[in-house]
Amino acid sequence: TCLVNNLPAQAGTKNNTTSNIVASSNWNRQSVMDIARRVADWQIKDYPENKYAKSEPRGWIAGALYMGMFDWAELSGDNTYYDWLRKIFNRQNWQVANRMYHADDVCIAQTYIDFYNKEKNENMLKPTIARADWVLNNPSNGSMDLDYSKGSTIERWTWCDALFMAPGVYTRLYTLTGNRKYMHFADSEFRATYNHLYDKDEDLFYRDSRYIGQKEANDKKIFWGRGNGWVIGGLAEILKTLPADDKEFRPFYLDLFKEMSERLAWLQGKDGYWHASLLDPDSYPSPETSATGFIVYGLAYGINQGYLPANKYLPVVKKGWEALIRAVETDGKLGWVQPVGADPKKVTRDMTELYGTGAFLMAASEIYQLAEK
């Protein structure tokens, strides 16, 4: 296994003597607060016009935004952002989305539980517990081979994005209630996905079983940037929300987190971004800020917790943060976000989406702790 601080130039972490030095004006807490506020405020202003906010306010696309917005509300201490979230959630009656088993449809519950932990209002929690208990009592035996023509195959976590959407619901419920049934279920399902989609030679996840054996133009395997961003972000959420003293489940997730972190650090582009295709960036040379945001979030969280050595990973995180900042327009719109999809696609600067902002705000909340006071 490579050591991150001995990476070759093409990995983009040591391509010249200045590449690792973030403009000092950006690497301080006030700057992090300012840019995060600008991004959050632009998104709130644009939210009513967003097609997914209109059609699926309880869906995963908005759900990933809510997670970042909650982190930002905590960081800023500004009740405006809590109020914005609470208003949306009250309108939804704190319900999860409709598909009983679908991981995407419980992503929002992670923020519901965080809100409950803050305000202790049981109405925030009841629908989530009802859904989780139903799934536990009626486990799906669908195949792990994703096939959209067979509904039972999306009842399991058969695509790697699901590892961000659902496990953090169950880790939170386990920590909140002390009931091990939630963690036994989540651990069993996560490991089924890991066994099916994780490539132990590459230390990366296939998006789903359809991509196993497929090749990019350069004859490398297809590993999607945002897909692996979802996983590293999801692992950070699992580690963050498991009980601190847990010794039964944590070791597996921590080992996987470290293994993937090392591989992802190696794959950062010279420009500081991770690209839509992790192993064929030449075919997809444009920045991709949803992958970059989730990966920066994961790595920064790892440094803050002492899981990843700062001397190796801080240069990677600084470079990634600088890249994210370059993608923000003066009005706060985050660009270069790959649209909804399942595999590498071309991205342009004008593309944005709710989960891209969510990833940016999650990253900002960890970067703030790393930045100079």
Where do the protein language model's features map onto the residues?
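Membrane-embedded glycan transfer/ligation machinery
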Residues: 63-66, 109, 164-167, 229-232, ...
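Extended ligand-binding groove/face enriched in aromatic
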Residues: 82-86, 94-212, 217-223, 331
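Bacterial Sec-dependent N-terminal signal peptides
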Residues: 1-17
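Extended ligand-binding clefts on enzyme/binding-domain cores
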Residues: 160-161, 168-278, 285-296, 308-337, ...
